[in-house]
């Protein structure tokens, strides 16, 4: 599995309160394919009809993901927090900047440094 982490990753309040070192370790463990319970990853969908996917980090241990590229744009401690906190902030930021919610363009621009947080 190839994983990239977007610049200025969106984090839930829980992750924002953790030491940066611990957050970096969690991200490294996801990249290395280690089991990470209680972590939900928000990533860019590779489906042309979808924008984002919210999945538990342990899903990436399945063989299906070994050949996929995952671009992580956010982390949360639960699905509800991913939707009610992180996704709401993403939507607000994207809409303020572009007047729409085209997350694929928004995060591509963030990855390229064309958009700051």
Which functions belong to the PLM regions below?
Residues 9, 13, 39, 63-64, ...:
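Intrinsically disordered, low-complexity N-terminal regions enriched in serine/proline/glycine
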Residues 15, 114-117:
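Long, low-complexity intrinsically disordered regions enriched in Ser/Thr, Asp/Glu, Pro/Gly
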Residues 16, 21-23, 49-50, 55-57, ...:
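Mixed-charge, polar/low-complexity N-terminal
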Residues 6-10, 55, 73, 102:
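N-terminal functional modules and adjacent low-complexity/disordered segments of proteins
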Residues 70-114:
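Short, compact, well-ordered microdomains
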Residues 33-70:
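Short aromatic-glycine-(Arg/Gly/Cys) micro-motifs in beta-strand/loop hairpins
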Residues 1-30:
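Negatively charged, low-complexity tracts enriched in Asp/Glu with abundant Ser/Thr
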